[in-house]
A protein has these predicted regions:
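Conserved Walker B
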Residues: 73
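Alpha-amylase-like alpha-glycosidases and glucanotransferases acting on alpha-linked glucans and related
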Residues: 1-67, 76-271
Length: 271
């Protein structure tokens, strides 16, 4: 009886308690990677931003804080607009972001910040302790000892496929439903299946060369379309039977609308 009453009480909450592994296959919120407890705060909403930043901004204006470290900036819905709002509220504050930059990748120039927290610097420091001329020798020793012959590139792709397809299946499923809902309105996408879209999404994620892109109707780094096309091209090479799904995903990511879309339909596409 006591458990029944507890269940009634918990069922009245605005959240549902569940076994933590359920989120692998079914999830309705954004989180950091696959860590269920690190729930994303929707700071893209004005009310949420103001409420969650009120004390921080108050301390900045009092001179108690002179710098901010923005953790996991890429987990936000719209990092660029977030940083614009933050800069409006804290014009003279020193701001750095935790950002994983791929080889040759630069920060978006429209971000009004002082830089990153320094991961790329740590990578450079690590290279000081690694004599690259002996790479082939070390690789040979490792291969003979482990009897492991898979290349680094193939191993990365294999593990990305495992993480995206299994440990983040719920997130992929949500994306597949969103894309299918949009695609079903048009003759180009009416026959796409959820299964095919799931496979296509995972494969694009596997081949994506950077952590994320920053594209909307107003801002876009010149390199972002290049990253997107590269990922889709490689995905088409491994899954040629899903060329239609992959092309639709590319058009969605690049905001290439069909000519007959209404303004409301274009907003849904962007979402």
């Amino acid at each position: 009886e006591s458990f029944r009453k507890l269940d009634v009480l918990l069922s009245r909450q605005s959240f549902r308690l569940s076994f933590w592994r359920a989120a692998t296959e079914e999830i309705n919120y954004r989180r950091f990677f696959n860590v269920n407890e690190l729930i994303c705060v929707r700071v893209e909403q004005e009310e949420v931003f103001n409420h969650s930043h009120e004390l921080i901004i108050h301390w900045i204006r009092q001179g108690k804080i002179t710098g901010l470290r923005i953790d996991h900036i890429d987990g936000l819905y719209d990092p660029t607009r977030y940083l614009m709002k933050l800069r409006e509220a804290a014009a003279d504050c020193y701001v750095v972001v935790e950002k994983i930059l791929g080889p040759g990748e630069d920060l978006p120039t429209c971000w009004m910040i002082q830089g990153t927290t320094g991961y790329e610097f740590l990578n450079a420091v690590n290279e000081v302790f690694c004599y690259s001329a002996h790479k082939s020798k070390l690789t040979g020793i490792y291969s003979r000892f482990s009897r492991f012959r898979t290349s680094c590139e193939d191993l990365v792709a294999e593990k990305k496929r495992l993480i995206a397809g299994k440990h983040m299946a719920g997130d992929v499923d949500n994306l597949a439903h969103l894309i299918k809902k949009t695609a079903a309105r048009y003759r180009h996408g009416s026959d796409m299946t959820l299964h095919g879209l799931r496979r296509a999404i995972v494969e694009v994620l596997v081949h994506f060369p950077v952590y994320r892109t920053y594209m909307d109707r107003e801002t876009c780094r010149p390199e972002d379309p290049v990253y997107t096309k590269e990922a889709v091209r490689k995905a088409m090479w491994t899954l040629p039977e899903l060329a239609n799904e992959l092309q639709f995903i590319e058009n969605s990511l690049l905001l290439k609308f069909w000519d007959d879309l209404t303004e409301e339909e274009q907003k849904d596409w962007i979402h």
